[in-house]
Amino acid sequence: MRRVQLLDCTLRDGGYCNDCHFGFENEKKIVNGLVESNIDVIECGFFKESIEYDSDYTRFNSLEQVGRIIPQNRGGKLFVVLADYGKFDPKKLPDYNGASVDGIRVAFHKKDMSGGLEACQKVKEKGYKVFVQAMVSVAYTDEEFLELISRVNEIE
């Protein structure tokens, strides 16, 4: 049986409550607390190329910026960001080097499934772990979910 992993999205989803304004020092404290709490996957915020970066907010336009809140001792945890399909160009991502995030959660709506999955493939080719986030899941029929699962399993 596979092991269940716990993902914490405080620094991203919690940003809907405070406009992602956590403060740089608090971002680092939260991440360290999550590592110490033995959370498996820590989502550090939003990745979106078009935003203006401010270190007090968990919205990033480069993966290097995300690396500033990731502790040197990662404690075996995975660090990720969420990126909406169409708001970043996976071709522009640096190749994975272990200095920043380990993976990217690619979010897309049903109408963007093909493009979203192509983006997932490109992210994976850069060496990152890929997490597929189908948005508004209630809009999918059972058959469409099965199609999505099948197509995700084809990503190499």
Language model feature labels by segment:
Residues 1-19, 76, 99, 129-133:
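N-terminal small/glycine-rich loop or linker at the start of catalytic domains
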Residues 2-9, 31-48:
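N-terminal glycine-rich anion-binding loops that anchor highly charged ligand groups
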Residues 9-12, 16, 47-49, 82-86, ...:
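Active-site beta-loop-alpha junctions enriched in small/polar residues
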